[in-house]
A protein has these predicted regions:
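Acidic, Mg2+-coordinating active-site environments of NTP-dependent enzymes
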Residues: 110-183
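Short acidic/polar capping segments at secondary-structure boundaries
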Residues: 36-38, 62, 90-91, 151, ...
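Short beta-strand segments
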Residues: 32-34, 87, 112, 147
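Generic detector of intrinsically disordered, low-complexity, polar/charged segments
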Residues: 29-32, 65, 86, 139, ...
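ATP-dependent carboxylate-amine ligase catalytic core
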Residues: 1-27, 48-129, 133
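Glycine-rich phosphate-binding P-loop
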Residues: 30-50
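Short, well-ordered turn and helix-capping elements at secondary-structure junctions
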Residues: 37, 60, 73, 171, ...
Length: 183
């Protein structure tokens, strides 16, 4: 407890440094990815696809907290990078909003809303509201992408007013996978 003020000041300094680095790269395309599950897989798939054309930096494994993202930005983000993929995790309401404030993504992907971390969120509605903080934090000229899960993600998609896309296996998805096989 005695070290808390010092540790908090150091953390703030690191976060502010990361924020300045990101703001100093106005051409950097920033993409936030959140969801109760599927974040890491979607991030790595997207990084693989985008790497065909762009220099991509993606947060490794599950570096999805303010200090994890801060560390990656401070230690790995270089001027050559064109795209930054930030996985955004949460255990409490407001956690995603904090990450959005750090990264300022232009694009957001919501992979799922499920019962993960109910011990801290309390209800699925709170989980959904917290995940939706990513979409709420996108700029007016940004775009949101949602899993076409036939459930909560689609309800969040319906209330979104910025450019949006529903993706999945269902026929109502604008981006749809067909004839999917596991090999």
């Amino acid at each position: 407890y005695i070290n808390h003020p010092v540790e908090a000041a150091i953390s703030r300094r690191y976060v502010n440094d990361a924020r300045r680095r990101l703001e100093g790269m106005p051409r950097l395309i920033t993409i936030g990815i959140t969801g109760s599950y599927g974040k890491t897989s979607v991030k790595f798939i997207l990084a693989t696809i985008l790497s065909e054309k762009y220099e991509v930096l993606a947060t490794p494994s599950s570096f999805n907290t303010p200090m994890g993202i801060t560390r990656i930005v401070r230690e790995q983000l270089q001027p050559r990078h064109q795209v930054f993929l930030a996985e955004m995790g949460a255990r409490h309401k407001g956690d995603i909003a904090e990450l959005v404030d750090l990264v300022h993504p232009k694009y957001g992907l919501l992979t799922s809303v499920g019962p993960q971390h109910l011990e801290t969120f309390g209800t699925i509605a709170t989980v959904a509201a917290t995940k939706y903080e990513l979409i709420e934090g996108l700029p007016a000229d940004g775009a949101a992408f949602f899993a076409g899960d036939g459930g909560i993600c689609e309800a969040l998609y319906a209330k979104t007013t910025i450019d949006k896309t529903l993706a999945g296996l269902a026929g109502n998805c604008a981006v749809r996978a067909e004839d999917v096989r596991v090999t």
